[in-house]
């Protein structure tokens, strides 16, 4: 029973990808593949924007849409499943006109409204942002410490982390504090994960002592 739904979605996405770019061209693949409904729409959007050299513009517009969707009044009118689709389409039309969004972004939002998939909008925006991050060569890195690092230590840490990247990659660093790790740090960079926290060291020591007894 699920096959017709998936097939219909595929047709809609392909139609969107080509509806804003003429002549019809081969789909431009994003630098990273994201699955699911959000991934399909984001891929089509990336392809359409890439063909018109408007990736940066579309990304900025989507970030603006994401901000607008956080407004309680707007969210209640277009994300509420009990609101009639026709009303949502009208609200979206007013929004895109007021914000003067590009045809690419407007077509996406209108398509989501017409197909009853506006609730997928935040996920689609997130997927597109991930694609753009990889497109720019950004490598996400999260460093968690028990307390805030001094500026000198943070600067040295950035230099060390950057040394692990290739020349065309850019470090996108996020620093968090979590007193529960007790000391040391936890580093997640790309797909690599290194736990050097005092908490983990204590847990390993405790386990080793129990096994030795």
UniProtKB/Swiss-Prot annotation:
InterPro entries cross-referenced by the UniProt entry: ATP_synth_OSCP/delta_N_sf, ATPase_OSCP/d_CS, ATPase_OSCP/dsu
Compartment(s) where it occurs, according to its Swiss-Prot or TrEMBL record: Mitochondrion; Mitochondrion inner membrane
Modified residues (N6-succinyllysine): 90, 100, 158
PTM section of the record: In response to mitochondrial stress, the precursor protein is ubiquitinated by the SIFI complex in the cytoplasm before mitochondrial import, leading to its degradation. Within the SIFI complex, UBR4 initiates ubiquitin chain that are further elongated or branched by KCMF1.
Alphabetical list of PROSITE patterns matching this protein: ATPASE_DELTA
Keyword tags: Acetylation, ATP synthesis, Hydrogen ion transport, Ion transport, Membrane, Mitochondrion, Mitochondrion inner membrane, Transit peptide, Transport, Ubl conjugation
Presequence extent in this chain: 1-23
A Pfam family this chain is assigned to: OSCP
Residues that bear N6-acetyllysine: 54, 60, 70, 73, 100, 158, 172, 176, 192
Location, primary (coarse class): mitochondrion
Gene Ontology CC entries for this record: mitochondrial inner membrane; proton-transporting ATP synthase complex
Membrane-spanning segments: none
Motif SIFI-degron location, chain numbering: 5-23
GO molecular function: proton-transporting ATP synthase activity, rotational mechanism
Similarity section: Belongs to the ATPase delta chain family.
Subunit structure: Component of the ATP synthase complex composed at least of ATP5F1A/subunit alpha, ATP5F1B/subunit beta, ATP5MC1/subunit c (homooctomer), MT-ATP6/subunit a, MT-ATP8/subunit 8, ATP5ME/subunit e, ATP5MF/subunit f, ATP5MG/subunit g, ATP5MK/subunit k, ATP5MJ/subunit j, ATP5F1C/subunit gamma, ATP5F1D/subunit delta, ATP5F1E/subunit epsilon, ATP5PF/subunit F6, ATP5PB/subunit b, ATP5PD/subunit d, ATP5PO/subunit OSCP.
Reported function: Subunit OSCP, of the mitochondrial membrane ATP synthase complex (F(1)F(0) ATP synthase or Complex V) that produces ATP from ADP in the presence of a proton gradient across the membrane which is generated by electron transport complexes of the respiratory chain. ATP synthase complex consist of a soluble F(1) head domain - the catalytic core - and a membrane F(1) domain - the membrane proton channel. These two domains are linked by a central stalk rotating inside the F(1) region and a stationary peripheral stalk.
Classification via HAMAP family: ATP_synth_delta_bact
Name of the featured protein: ATP synthase peripheral stalk subunit OSCP, mitochondrial
Name of the coding gene: ATP5PO
């Amino acid at each position: 029973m699920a096959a017709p739904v998936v097939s219909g979605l595929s047709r809609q996405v392909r139609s969107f990808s080509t509806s804003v770019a003429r002549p019809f061209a081969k789909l431009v693949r994003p630098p990273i593949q994201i699955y699911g409904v959000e991934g399909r729409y984001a891929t089509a959007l990336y392809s359409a924007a890439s063909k018109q050299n408007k990736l940066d513009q579309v990304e900025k517009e989507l970030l603006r849409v994401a901000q607008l969707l956080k407004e309680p009044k707007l969210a209640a009118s277009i994300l509420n499943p009990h609101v009639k689709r026709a009303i949502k389409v009208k609200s979206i039309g007013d929004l895109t006109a007021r914000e003067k969004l590009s045809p690419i972004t407007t077509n996406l939002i209108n398509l989501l409204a017409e197909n009853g998939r506006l609730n997928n909008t935040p996920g689609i925006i997130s997927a597109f942002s991930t694609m753009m991050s990889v497109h720019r060569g950004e490598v996400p890195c999260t460093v968690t410490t028990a307390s805030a690092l001094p500026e000198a230590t943070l600067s040295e840490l950035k230099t060390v982390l950057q040394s692990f990247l290739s020349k065309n990659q850019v470090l996108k660093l996020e620093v968090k504090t979590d007193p529960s790790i007790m000391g040391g740090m936890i580093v997640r960079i790309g797909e690599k994960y290194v736990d050097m926290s005092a908490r983990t060291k204590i847990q390993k020591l405790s386990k080793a002592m129990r096994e030795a007894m």
